[in-house]
UniProtKB/Swiss-Prot annotation:
Compartments, record wording: Cytoplasm
InterPro entries the record matches: Ade_phspho_trans (IPR005764), PRibTrfase_dom (IPR000836), PRTase-like (IPR029057), UPRTase/APRTase (IPR050054)
Enzyme class, first EC level, given as a word: transferase
Protein name: Adenine phosphoribosyltransferase
Organism field: Geobacillus thermodenitrificans (strain NG80-2)
Length: 170
């Protein structure tokens, strides 16, 4: 299935000059959403995943159905102040400043094989920070899965050494 036909390109969003890749039109189509999810599930099975991790919010949209299909848990990664119990945290650089991501301290057990999911691989900053959280907890990052990769932004380079699945490239 050509998943690109289900992605809507929105010019000048969120700011002028950006061509936003809207995944909601893929999600609106049950057949396309199922196909995309099934592709990631197949990849995850090959990696013998114990748990799926995803950063808010679109990483949840991708990761939760994958975890369900695999019969494994899902651990959310959230911005600081959003998780109610003790967390590990990582600060990471943005284009203008820094941000912080957190994860419950007991979300990953040492040695667990982890699949990290997100909708989009752009610069790789959010994914790199998510990897750092998983590894702080002793998890083994067995794979990274994205719906879309924006190749011109070079995020894959920031993630060298990790196995990456992208379903579409723009």
């Amino acid at each position: 299935m050509d998943l690109k036909q289900y992605i809507t390109i929105v010019p000048d969003f969120p700011k002028p000059g950006i061509l936003f890749k809207d995944i909601t039109t893929l999600m609106d189509n049950g057949e396309a959403y199922k196909y995309a999810t099934d592709q990631i599930v197949e990849y995850a099975r090959e990696k013998q995943i114990d748990i799926v991790v995803g950063p808010e919010a679109r990483g949840f949209i991708i990761g939760c159905p994958v975890a369900y299909a695999l019969g494994v848990g899902f651990a959310p990664v959230r911005k600081e102040g959003k998780l109610p119990r003790e967390v590990v945290r990582v600060e990471y650089g943005l284009e203008y400043g820094t941000d912080v991501l957190t994860m419950h301290k007991d979300a990953i057990k040492p040695g667990q094989r982890v699949l990290i999911t997100d909708d989009l691989l752009a610069t790789g900053g959010t994914m790199r920070a998510t990897i750092d959280l998983v590894e702080q907890l002793g998890g083994v990052v067995a794979g990274l899965a994205f719906l879309i990769e924006l190749t011109e932004l070079g995020g894959r380079k920031k993630l060298e050494g990790y196995d990456i699945l992208t379903l579409m490239q723009f």
